[in-house]
């Protein structure tokens, strides 16, 4: 379920990028945007190297420690959303189950990281296979609770494209959208439970 977002941004002296216009063309890119397609080539080389490591490293190179900082940010954002909402009951919504699940996931992620390091040191094939299976599968826990309200196709409990934010994601979308978009505190309570459950499933997959 993991995905990758890779892109190149303009520098301060670069020409304007005619995004989604008739001037967004091969001619513009070849003459102005990336003359010689140097950036394109480097990005292709990087992706090739990344794919090589994902396929050939003894352990899939995922940095589970990144989840700790990101989940802390997601929780802080949710708390701010709830405290600033005019929806009756939002400021007092009980998210303790979610906080407990996040803490448990962070603990399991650290234990899985330690187990992966020990497996690498030992070179034990069975242990390496077990670790890789966990790293491959744990994201499935985040999609284990059914689709989001009114858009069943989106199933991830940690983030999803916003209903009206274009490419920008919404974190803890089931809870956040229940409050911000639907004004439904009962739905928010339901998705606190579902979100916590999805995180627990992911943590259970990671558990050594």
Question: Where do the model's predicted regions map?
Answer:
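Secretory-pathway/membrane protein signature
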Residues: 1-208
């Amino acid at each position: 379920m993991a995905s990758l977002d890779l892109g190149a941004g303009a520098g301060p002296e670069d020409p304007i990028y005619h995004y989604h216009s008739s001037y967004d063309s091969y001619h513009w890119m070849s003459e102005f945007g990336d003359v010689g397609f140097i950036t394109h080539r480097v990005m292709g080389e990087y992706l090739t190297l990344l794919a090589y490591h994902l396929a050939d490293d003894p352990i899939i190179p995922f940095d589970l420690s990144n989840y700790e900082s990101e989940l802390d940010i997601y929780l802080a954002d949710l708390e701010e959303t709830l405290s600033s909402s005019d929806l009756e009951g939002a400021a007092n919504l009980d998210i303790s189950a979610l906080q407990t699940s996040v803490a448990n996931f962070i603990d399991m992620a650290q234990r899985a990281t330690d187990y992966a390091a020990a497996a690498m040191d030992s070179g034990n094939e069975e242990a390496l296979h077990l670790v890789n299976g966990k790293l491959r599968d744990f994201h499935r826990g985040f999609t284990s609770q059914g689709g989001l309200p009114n858009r069943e196709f989106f199933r991830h409990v940690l983030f999803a494209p916003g209903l009206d934010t274009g490419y920008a994601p919404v974190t803890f979308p089931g809870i956040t959208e229940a409050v911000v978009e639907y004004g439904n505190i009962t739905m928010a309570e339901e998705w606190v439970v579902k979100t916590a459950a999805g995180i627990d499933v992911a943590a259970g997959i990671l558990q050594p």
